[in-house]
Structures are given as C-alpha cells and as structure tokens.
Design a protein with these regions (language model features):
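Alpha/beta catalytic cores of nucleotide-metabolism and tRNA/nucleoside-modifying enzymes
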Residues: 1-46, 291-309, 313-381
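Short, conserved beta-strand segments within well-ordered enzyme catalytic domains
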Residues: 49, 64-66, 75-79, 105-109, ...
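A gly/proline- and charged-residue-enriched helix-loop-helix capping module
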Residues: 101-122, 126-140
Length: 381
C-alpha cells in the first residue's frame, strides 16, 4: 500500500497498521476498557444531519478562525500527543512542519519527544504546550516558565488524566516505555523489520520536557508509573486558578465535559476549554464530546472559546461541530496514523484532505465563511 492510495482516515490507519509492530499500533489505536467511548466518539456524528442551502455564491471560501487569540487558516489543529518518535523517527518535527505549511496550530506534549525549543524553531504557527499537573509544585512552575521563555502561545492543562486509563490492549502486548514486551509483543516487532530499521538507525528515544526532572531511562520510571506516581490526583480548582494567574496568557483546560466545570473554567479566567474524553482512553462509558457540545456552548459559549476533539475523521465532522458552536476542532489519531505510515508527507496529505473536505462541504452547504455556519444547518435524528 502506497501513500497515494490513502484517501481517508481508514486508509491511513490501514497503512500504519501494515508498517507498525502490533504493540505500537495498538497504543495509538486502542482505548480504555471495552472501548465503548472510543467508538461512540465517531458514531456520535452520525446522529446529526447537515441541511445545505443553495444559490449562495460560494466561489470564494474563507475557512479561517480565531481561537484563544490565535489566527488559524483552518478550523482544526493538531492536538498534542505523546511519544510520537515511536511512530516515525520524524515525530513532532513532521507535525510542526505540516502545521506551519497549512497555517494551523499544533501542540507539544509533556510526553513529547522533541523539546519545546526545537518545535518553536521549526514552526511559526501558534504552539500549544499540553501540560500535566505534578505533585511537585516547583516542577510545575519550572515547566511553565520554560514554555513562556520559548514563546508558547497557549498553555493547555489536561485535567482528565490524574491517573492512567485501563488500556487492555497494552496489557496484552506488554507495551510500556521503556520497552518491556511479553513474548507475543516481541514477536510482533520481529514481523515488522522496516519499523525497527527506521527506529534504530535514527536518534534515540527521549522525552526532553521531562529529562531534567524525571529519570525515564534505565527502567526506573515507566509511562504508567509516571501517571500514577508523578501526577497529582489532589489537584483542585484553586490550583488551576493559580496556574492561570502565573501564566498570564491564553490558558486552556483539556478534558472538560460538564456544564458545571465549564462555568468554573470561565470563573477562573481560562481562555478556552476542550471538550474531550482523551480519545476514549481514560473513562470508558463517558459521553462523546460532540454529544455534549451544544449543552456547554449554550452555557458558556459567549464567554469562553469552546473547542472539541474526539473521533473526528471527516471534514463534515468538523462542519457539524462548528455549526453547533465549537470555535475549532482538535485532531489526534487523524494525523498520527499518517505520521506512522509515511512521516511528514503522510501528515501533509492528511491535512490537505481535511482542508479539501471542509472547503467542499462549505460550498455544498452554501457557506463562504465559518461564521455562516449555525444550528440552522443541522437536524438531529
């Protein structure tokens, strides 16, 4: 299968599956428990129909948006995701370059495999730093200060991951960082020598945001232990309010799903919230972000930028979310599978396909700008 044969999310996923060892593919593709929420994230869009208008003069399309003060050429962005170096040696570098080419925002994770400084040097596009709240308050302050010095535009605190989700696919293969595979997992690596050549003939795996603070090497600290031992489950709204004051710039909470929490985010001065269930990877059975979007937009949409992610695989999914009131949409697996399949060319092809789908969809709906999308364009079954 070649990159030019990939025309949609499923094609990229299939190509990535052919290239990646099973444990790494399952790390991207898998979710928590029975993966009900994971499936529901995409299925939720199917209960909503688009109602187009015609004869509206749509020869010129403007799909730009402004979210949390950042001007994006397209209404979707590359959400911060962890461990990208495992999927392809270009990792976040490929994503940053692709985001710059298409004029959209991208994010670097606390578990990212390139440094904030390097990512900032690659792309002038708006950059998000996805941050986890640690037990060590000094560590939190130091990491925020580092992001500020680099010129990160948006601080994004993930609030739905105070402990790791129950990802049973990883348990079956023994997937962990550092690698501690069982026999079945090791056999899968042996079947994919091309991945091994790519991985071992390029620079080694590292986590630059944590290198100075946490020893992740030598088997001393696994990713799962990082979540259970380093992150602070006692985090409260008072802690977050203090972070918002310290950052004194656009601050976003990722993982908000209730109206009550959305209102609290407004009260403490957040610029945005991301409705997210972490791609179904944390609390299985939780509500899909798209299903919860209208309720939260109605409650706080005039006071804070409401964003959503989860299950987005088509341009029409983005248009439905925007019509409900989202200011932008985050994508994760949508670009990770192309990254794993083909590096930067794969990510660029995926972003271009999404751009074209949104442009085509807007023309067919009779909308020449994002601001013309509204709930009048939607009907729920």
């Amino acid at each position: 299968m070649r990159l030019r044969d990939c025309h949609n999310f499923s094609d990229f996923r299939r190509m990535a599956q052919r290239r990646l060892p099973g444990p790494i593919f399952d790390y991207i593709d898998g979710a928590a428990d029975d993966e009900v929420t994971y499936r529901r994230n995409t299925e939720s869009f199917e209960t909503c129909d688009l109602v187009p208008n015609v004869l509206r003069g749509v020869s010129e399309i403007d799909m730009s948006v402004t979210v949390m003060g950042q001007k994006l050429a397209m209404p979707f962005y590359c959400s911060p995701t962890a461990l990208q170096r495992l999927f392809h040696h270009q990792g976040e570098r490929a994503v940053a370059k692709a985001a710059a080419k298409y004029g959209t925002m991208f994010g670097v994770s606390s578990l990212g495999t390139v440094s904030l400084e390097e990512a900032r040097g690659i792309s002038v596009s708006p950059q998000v730093y996805q941050f986890y709240f640690h037990r060590d308050r000094g560590l939190n302050r130091a990491m925020m200060q580092r992001a500020k010095q680099v010129g990160v535009e948006v601080m994004m605190l993930t609030v739905d991951s105070i402990t790791g989700g129950n990802r049973e696919r990883d348990k079956r293969t023994g997937f962990a960082i550092p690698f501690k595979l069982n026999l079945a997992g090791m056999a899968q690596f042996a079947l994919k020598p091309a991945w091994a050549i790519n991985y071992f003939t390029h620079e080694g795996f590292k986590l630059p945001q944590l290198d100075e603070h946490v020893d992740m090497g030598g088997g001393t600290m696994s990713i799962s232990r990082y979540f259970t031992e380093m992150l602070d489950p006692s985090m409260t709204w008072d802690d977050v309010a203090e972070m918002v004051r310290q950052w004194s710039g656009p601050f976003c909470l990722k993982g908000i799903m209730s109206v009550e929490d959305a209102k609290r985010a407004v009260e403490i001065g957040c610029s945005g919230i991301v409705l997210s269930n972490h791609g179904g990877r944390q609390l299985d059975g939780s509500r899909a972000a798209f299903d919860q979007l209208a309720e939260i937009v109605d409650a706080v949409g005039d006071r804070i930028d409401v964003i959503m992610d989860g299950g987005v695989q088509r341009g029409t999914h983005v248009l439905k979310a925007l019509s409900l009131g989202a200011k932008a949409v985050g994508i994760g697996r949508y670009y990770l599978f192309p990254l794993a399949a083909a590096g930067q060319p794969g990510v660029e092809r995926a972003l271009e396909q999404m751009r074209v789908e949104i442009e085509r969809g807007m023309k067919l709906m009779g909308c020449s700008s994002i601001g013309q999308l509204s709930r009048e364009n939607l009907r729920f079954r």
